[in-house]
A protein has these predicted regions:
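Membrane-interface interhelical connector segments
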Residues: 1-7
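Peripheral terminal and linker regions in Fe-S/redox and tRNA-modifying enzymes
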Residues: 131-134
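Hydrophobic cores of alpha-helical transmembrane segments in multi-pass integral membrane proteins
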Residues: 7-35, 40-90, 97-127, 140-145, ...
Length: 154
């Protein structure tokens, strides 16, 4: 199974699960701190999370994994050389399965665009609610950092 389409299954799911989600989480954590306690409209982040994950699952389950399993079967029956050959990869079934990946890619891209829309909204102010900023301890994050440090020193 090594070197067949099962390798991208592992690469796409594991790398995005570890580094992609970690990166998005760190970005959102940092953006939350930069927002000085202002409340977010959370629906774009929620929908972005689910569409990105559903898109990745569709990409893997509709295309990469089925092709990888077909290649594994072909490698067991005829050898790895055949499973990786153009003769096998250009059959009608594998071609259709490769095109099925577009569904998952489209859903994934919609989630990425929604996340981008949310981040752009943080810059323009449209991703914030009109509620009062969140207060932590006696300090209000809506104060500039210099005033927070000056107040803490008193």
């Amino acid at each position: 199974m090594q070197g067949l389409n099962t390798t991208p299954v592992h690469g796409h799911t594991a790398l995005f699960g570890v580094y992609g989600m970690l990166g998005i989480g760190l970005m959102l954590f940092s953006l939350r701190a930069l927002g000085q306690g202002r409340r977010w409209k959370e629906w774009p982040v929620r929908y972005a999370f689910w569409t990105i994950n559903v898109g990745l699952a569709l990409m893997v389950l509709l295309s990469l994994l089925p092709i990888g399993l077909l290649q594994t079967w072909a490698a067991v029956e005829h050898g790895t050389w055949y499973a990786r050959s153009a003769e096998f990869m250009q059959t009608g079934l594998t071609t259709n399965l490769r095109w099925m990946r577009a569904f998952g890619d489209t859903v994934f891209a919609a989630g990425a665009l929604l996340l981008g829309y949310f981040v752009l909204g943080l810059v323009t102010g449209t991703s914030y609610t009109k509620e009062e900023p969140v207060k932590v301890n006696e300090f209000d994050y809506a104060l500039p950092l210099g005033e927070i440090h000056a107040t803490a020193a008193d």
